[in-house]
Amino acid sequence: MFQCKIERAYIHAPYFINLASSEKHIRLNSINVIRDELERGSALGCRALMFHPGSAKDVGQEKGIKLVIEGLDRIMDGYTGSCQLLIEISAGAGAVIGDSFEEIASLLDGANRGAEIGVCFDTQHAFASGYDLRTDSSVRKTIKDFDRTIGLECLVVLHVNDSMSEFNSHKDRHEHLGNGKIGLEGFKTLVGLKSLSHVDLILETPDDNLRRKDLLVLKNLR
């Protein structure tokens, strides 16, 4: 990474992970995969590993949250690595865990080592889950709500994506910056907030060939 001039690298855990599954073997496999990824990330010098907690469709939200907390405790038990675990906000499809600030806060508060776990804020997922990011005022309100509910000290990285799907649609559909339902006004405010100056930005827009243009858009907004 040093040779490639990469200061901070991040890992995304596999999408099949489900700490809220009704099946014990799925939960255990998910725990092992995340722990292995954390250890691997530490060995590689990666900054953090983000993951989606999973779906509670077979057990209900209350039980699902308890299972995720149990999973987090097992993942973090004895862990001494440098790669930080991050919960990424979800778009809210089905019975997923972690599609609201309140649910993420409950996971961090409930886990034994929750103070060591951070958050990845994906703009498209948040928008699809009902957090408005289209205007200066709506972005400021959303970030204020995040700070009040979770705490900006827990926010480590932003996945910066416009949204192909409508506001509060609960659909995970990324779009290139300025071409989606969020628009550039919100992103201009987001990248200019001093309260987020400590946060890294990662683009997850769909077409690799157009991502350089998205990067230029972000730089111009600043």
Where are the model-predicted features located?
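Active-site beta-loop-alpha junctions enriched in small/polar residues
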Residues: 14-16, 54-56, 88-94, 124-128, ...
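Active-site acidic/histidine proton-transfer and metal-coordination neighborhood
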Residues: 19-118
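Gly/Pro-rich active-site loop or hairpin
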Residues: 62, 97-105, 127-198
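C-terminal helical cap(s) of enzyme catalytic domains, especially alpha/beta-barrels
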Residues: 209-222
